[in-house]
Structure formats: C-alpha cells, structure tokens
Amino acid sequence: MKNIHCINHPLIEHKLGILRAKETKPFQFRMLIDEISSFLLFEASKDFSLKEIEISTLIQKTTVKKLDEKIMICPILRAALGMLESVFKMIPDASVGFLGFVRNEETLKADFYFQKLPKDAKKRTAIVIDPMFATGGTAIEACNFLKSQGVKKIKFISILAAPQGLKKFSQMHDDVEVFVACIDEGLNEKGYIIPGLGDAGDRVFNTL
C-alpha cells in the first residue's frame, strides 16, 4: 500500500505510550493529540508547493518562499476537533471544512449527517483529520464526498489505524495519502482498534 505512511519517530512512540494509558487525564490526552498531530502534519505537508516572493528585511530586500497551495482542513466530527488546533497553528491561513459522521453500532458503517465546506473547496488541498482509522468506512465516505465536490488533492491524517481499514481504504482511494502514527494489531468484534486507546472523542471531551 504505497499510499500509506506510518511515521516512525522516538518522540511519537513515547507520546503514544502515554496517550494509550487509561490513567492519562483528559487535559494531557488533548495535549498529546495536539503534539502528535503536528508531527504527522509535518510529514504530510512535505510536497506542498511553494512560490518565491520578495520582502524587505530590516537590512535589505530578499527573496523568500511562501506556500502556494490553498489548504482546507477537514476534521471529522467530533473526535478530530482535538487535532484541529495543532493543524491551525501550523497553517493559520487554512480554511476549515467540517464533516459529520456517526457510526452505526450494529452495522459498523458510517452515517453521514453534516457537512460545511468553504465555497472554494474544489480549489483547495484537503487535509482530512480523524484520530482513529478503524474499519476505514468513515475515511472512505469522507473522501467519496470530497471528490464529489470537486476536490482533487486529499491527504488523510490519523493517530492510530487498523490494517484492515487501511487495506480497504487503499482499494477505494489509492490516490489519497494516509499518514498515521501507528498501525495497531487489528479490530475487535465491535470494530474498535486494538490495543488502541479507547474512544478518542470521549477522552478528548471527558465524556467517558
């Protein structure tokens, strides 16, 4: 799966260990999600195009580089809201396009219930964020929708992923690069990532 990138780094592995622990408090969990998301965005943005512009320093004029892509961050509600701030800090001029999905606990399929994209979405590179990439259903439907709206370039960032979901996703969207901090063992009978870290949304918003 050439479109799947698992980012190996000692600091990511250290932070993931704390993130997984059930004793980790919500405020610390949010901080770790923020930090790991920044690492992943750094990797996902390596091929962003640049343009040269002229500026004046305090000493003289010089040529510097500036991002030449319009970016749209697409958090999948609600858990991805914990990742949004870190991406915004790195790309403050980005727009945000919200995508709302809720998982049907019986079928394990993602039901699409809300979307709010910027008017120029088709002209932007979409960075979809969702901390958990489990069955792949939500990711597939999110990319299906974005492509139906004319979005040409999509990247996906998740903290944890299951191999089953990544394989299924790659079969449907091999043109979408996925950046994850760790690929876990798999899924349990309820479709949750194992060993995982629990429900990311509940841990971010302290609703356990």
Curated annotation (Swiss-Prot):
Pathway(s) served: Pyrimidine metabolism; UMP biosynthesis via salvage pathway; UMP from uracil: step 1/1
Enzyme class per UniProt: transferase
Top-level taxon of origin: Bacteria
Amino acids binding uracil: I193, G198, D199, A200
Reported regulation of activity: Allosterically activated by GTP.
Family to which this protein belongs: Belongs to the UPRTase family.
Name used for this protein in its record: Uracil phosphoribosyltransferase
